[in-house]
């Protein structure tokens, strides 16, 4: 269970770190991210802008909490909560027929849709699994090879998550 926890922890930390980097890579990128939240009209404009800032802060908190060994359970909880909020927002927007590009990782022009909901649910399940694995791993001692394998699996998973829009376009075109 220890290696499963490490994989889930690294996966979520990597995905959120890449998401943050894509959103804050420049003033225009951050503006596009905030605008993509506002244009969904889930909340009033001012509240949507504050929600965009809060979501970015929650992503950053997830990365920090997952990185520190004594805050891992809280990191998983914050990650799952953040993913739940993001998924809920996407679902509300889809029900209202509103579309905006997914600026989750930066400059994508793919509109938010069902694949993004599924992606977020899989990531949330990874967070819940990681929390359960953390609780079950107790005082287990990690072997370097096991840690390396878990980190490689997390890196592959993060790559698939981040490039999901491109992969879907490639295989559905």
Where are these regions (language model features)?
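Membrane-interfacial helix-loop segments of redox and metal-homeostasis proteins
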Residues: 1-173
């Amino acid at each position: 269970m220890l290696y499963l926890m490490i994989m889930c922890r690294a996966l979520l930390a990597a995905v959120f770190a890449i998401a943050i980097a894509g959103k804050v890579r420049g003033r225009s990128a951050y503006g596009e991210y905030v605008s993509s939240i506002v244009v969904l009209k889930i909340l009033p404009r001012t509240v949507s802008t504050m929600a965009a800032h809060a979501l970015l802060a929650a992503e950053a908190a997830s990365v920090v909490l997952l990185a520190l060994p004594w805050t891992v359970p809280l990191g998983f909880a914050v990650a799952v909560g953040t993913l739940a909020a993001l998924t809920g927002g996407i679902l509300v927007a889809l029900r209202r027929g509103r579309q905006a590009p997914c600026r989750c990782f930066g400059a994508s022009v793919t509109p938010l849709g069902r694949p993004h909901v599924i992606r977020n649910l899989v990531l949330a399940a990874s967070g819940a699994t990681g929390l359960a694995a953390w609780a079950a791993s107790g005082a287990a001692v990690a072997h370097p090879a096991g840690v390396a394998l878990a980190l490689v699996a997390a890196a592959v998973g993060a790559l698939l998550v981040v490039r999901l829009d491109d992969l879907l376009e490639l295989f559905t075109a």
